Amino acid sequence: MDADKIVFKVNNQVVSLKPEIIVDQYEYKYPAIKDLKKPCITLGKAPDLNKAYKSVLSGMNAAKLDPDDVCSYLAAAMQFFEGTCPEDWTSYGILIARKGDRITPNSLVEIKRTDVEGNWALTGGMELTRDPTVSEHASLVGLLLSLYRLSKISGQNTGNYKTNIADRIEQIFETAPFVKIVEHHTLMTTHKMCANWSTIPNFRFLAGTYDMFFSRIEHLYSAIRVGTVVTAYEDCSGLVSFTGFIKQINLTAREAILYFFHKNFEEEIRRMFEPGQETAVPHSYFIHFRSLGLSGKSPYSSNAVGHVFNLIHFVGCYMGQVRSLNATVIAACAPHEMSVLGGYLGEEFFGKGTFERRFFRDEKELQEYEAAELTKTDVALADDGTVNSDDEDYFSGETRSPEAVYTRIMMNGGRLKRSHIRRYVSVSSNHQARPNSFAEFLNKTYSNDS
């Protein structure tokens, strides 16, 4: 008997077949660099920086920016941002810089140039006759890179959220050490003309390069990161959520995974912790792998590890976390089952802690405490099973465990308890639910059961 086949009759004829469905056609690519070569892009001929500044600023004022010219200018302007490397800097076996080296963002990557000239048109007229200062170059670089952050803000953010962000960014780049070079609201007007620029590979690459540089190098113009910070751990929302989750419940990654009671977690956990990646290495290329073009499809995104993502945010919802209530449910990854497990884990970690004395008046008190704890452990090991169950917790120190939670789920037939449902409804009904969010899912799914 083939376990994958089903048997049925059609017009009295027995049919045996294997039901097959559409599968994920994408192949997840891990970002580890194997050839010891720095990430690389190719741009047009390097421009005269003064001419390029005037052209790009003119285009910004007219809301008519040429992406190729902008990328060429951003790459050339890297020379203005020189800093000192604080420690030897290596990633995936590549030596980026030695301690004490003077480096620029260009030191992190390879930028090849062709002989193709840029347009460098003066779309908005010619206003600046003198050559720009370094502060003016820094302001223009900051405003241009901020177009990346604005284009990453989703339409789900309601009201004037994006406009307010743009206004705050403009204020940064008109305050020392920067200098005002555009009129108020220019950034938002320009953004509307290039709202999808985060999808342009070269622009994304340069945004990630600047961010990787300023995140490590102390610099007068480090505030440029305000526009590029979204490139850090981009398309890593699954891994980032898991990291936040284990800190929230105060467990190690290993301890937390023991609570993941579902077969669909197996592939996702394997995917998320693929060996050979620099997930835990500070200032690694890994942090900006998406923008630097090291992976076409991230294995760490919410879609790549959707069951893990759903579970984490159902636990977050149970604990009343606004970030989880606002997050978008991955509908294809068993949200109903994940909400059940999330209820039990939420109950396990909500309003309950593991505490012990860690600080003492003197060494004598510390030694007395340790001796008393040893005695308590010996009593627990010698327990003959007659100890009152309330005292059991006290003596064993084992107030929470994966086994206990799993047993509770099985005893309840894999269903949520009334108390879980009441908690879910309580936190979601008091929240302004966004479309397709966890708050909306919980409201629609459980409000009638409460």
Curated annotation (Swiss-Prot):
It holds the Pfam family Rhabdo_ncap. One of its GO terms (cellular component) is viral nucleocapsid. Signal peptide: none annotated. The modification Phosphoserine is found at S389. GO terms for molecular function: RNA binding. Its main location: virion. Keywords: Capsid protein, Helical capsid protein, Host cytoplasm, Phosphoprotein, Ribonucleoprotein, RNA-binding, Superantigen, Viral nucleoprotein, Virion. It is found in: Virion; Host cytoplasm. Phosphorylated by host CK2. Unphosphorylated protein N seems to have a better affinity for leader viral promoter encapsidation. Phosphorylation of protein N in ribonucleocapsid may stabilize the interaction with protein P, thereby playing an important role in viral transcription/replication. The keyword Ribonucleoprotein applies. SUPFAM superfamilies: Rhabdovirus nucleoprotein-like. Disulfide bonds: none annotated. Gene3D superfamilies: Nucleoprotein (1.10.3610.10), Rhabdovirus nucleocapsid protein like domain (1.10.3570.10). Homomultimerizes to form the nucleocapsid. Binds to viral genomic RNA. In nucleocapsid, binds protein P and thereby positions the polymerase on the template. Protein P acts as a chaperone on free protein N to prevent it from aggregation before encapsidating genomic RNA. Belongs to the lyssavirus nucleocapsid protein family. Displays a superantigen activity in human and mouse, activating mostly V-beta-8 subtypes of T-cell receptor. Encapsidates the genome in a ratio of one protein N per nine ribonucleotides, protecting it from nucleases. If expressed without protein P it binds non-specifically RNA and therefore can bind it's own mRNA. Interaction with protein P abolishes any non-specific RNA binding, and prevents phosphorylation. The soluble N-P complex encapsidates specifically the genomic RNA, with protein N protecting the genome like a pearl necklace. The encapsidated genomic RNA is termed the nucleocapsid (NC) and serves as template for viral transcription and replication. This is Nucleoprotein. It comes from Rabies virus (strain PM1503/AVO1). The gene is N.
